[in-house]
């Protein structure tokens, strides 16, 4: 699996991280850069997570009661507020949570996130709202180093009250930071953290600190960490992630076994970055994965099919003839810099 990951990343800059959800063991940590393999690409280079982050947003919003699985938001190619325009691809409208996540509707996640931050009935201040939001994200292993047993780890960014008040001089609200609702702006994560996010969803609310050494006796890596997310929030999100692979933005995986996943397309100067998080099988998951390819385009273009191949290799022990041909095609693609 490690060799396959390295082969898929040939000629590209990015990382593939896979973790066993049952015990936190790192199964694969393949990386590539213009100067060769560098583990910091997976654990020490936080970047915007893009729409993969919508899974964590949905779990938080459900847990706080800001939304229900039936909450619908209308979207016509995006949303405009004053001189701010955020685009979205064409899809039917309005959408409830399951389809909003499967189709990766930007409008849905921007508007629901803003409604949480601006809710002065549920929260006395916007500082309280953003602090509450941040605490959920931190409980899922985001926003700080996880203290894995590999040197070079960095924690990433999760906008908090102090940071926002300092950056925007106390003049901010939900729409000032609403890009965080779709994993852009004031939020960054490493591929390791994104893989661990997939672990927490696969396990419906808990994880072990990821570690590379399987024979560790250190209690740091043997103690379950529980998220703040309400237990009943996981089912609709997992169903939506399964729908994303079956009929949504991650359908390019095309597997015969049930994978749950979420693509991410990260806006970037030049060509977008391609990302994917997921786990398989849907029941009793054996592997969680995150793939991040710089300048790889849409999440469905590279990250999702790469993840599907690595998952197949792990669960089946080998690739089918068709999958091997796909792996060769991906390996032959060279993407070092933005083609724009």
Predicted feature locations:
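Short, charged, low-complexity patches
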Residues: 194, 299-311
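Beta-lactam-recognizing serine transpeptidase/beta-lactamase-like catalytic domain environment
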Residues: 14-50, 59-299, 332-340
């Amino acid at each position: 699996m490690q060799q396959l990951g390295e082969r898929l990343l040939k000629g590209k800059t990015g990382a593939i991280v896979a973790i066993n959800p049952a015990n936190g063991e790192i199964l694969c940590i393949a990386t590539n850069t213009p100067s060769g393999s560098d583990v910091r690409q997976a654990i020490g280079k936080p970047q915007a997570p893009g729409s993969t982050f919508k899974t964590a947003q949905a779990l938080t919003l459900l847990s706080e009661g800001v939304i229900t699985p039936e909450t619908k938001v209308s979207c016509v190619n995006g949303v405009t507020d004053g001189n701010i325009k955020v685009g979205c691809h064409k899809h039917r409208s309005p959408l409830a949570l399951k389809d909003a996540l499967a189709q990766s509707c930007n409008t849905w996640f921007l508007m629901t996130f803003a409604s949480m931050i601006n809710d002065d009935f549920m929260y006395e201040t916007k500082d309280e709202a953003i602090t509450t939001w941040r605490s959920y994200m931190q409980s899922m292993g985001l926003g700080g180093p996880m203290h894995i047993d590999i040197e070079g780890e960095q924690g990433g960014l999760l906008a908090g009250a102090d940071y926002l008040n300092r950056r925007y001089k106390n003049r901010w609200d939900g729409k000032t930071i609403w890009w965080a609702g779709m994993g852009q702006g004031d939020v960054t994560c490493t591929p390791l953290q994104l893989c661990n996010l997939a672990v927490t969803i696969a396990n419906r609310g808990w994880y072990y600190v990821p570690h590379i050494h399987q024979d560790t006796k250190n209690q740091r890596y043997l103690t379950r960490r529980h998220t703040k997310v309400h237990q009943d929030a996981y089912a609709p999100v997992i169903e939506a992630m399964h729908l994303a692979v079956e009929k949504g933005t991650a359908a390019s995986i095309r597997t015969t076994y049930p994978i749950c996943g979420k693509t991410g397309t990260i806006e970037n100067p030049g060509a977008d970055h391609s990302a994917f998080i997921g786990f398989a099988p849907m029941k009793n998951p054996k592997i969680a994965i995150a793939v991040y390819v710089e300048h790889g385009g849409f999440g469905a273009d590279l990250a999702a099919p790469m993840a599907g191949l690595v998952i197949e290799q792990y669960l089946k022990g080998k690739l089918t003839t068709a999958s091997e041909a796909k792996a060769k095609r991906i390996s032959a693609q060279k993407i070092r810099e933005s083609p724009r």
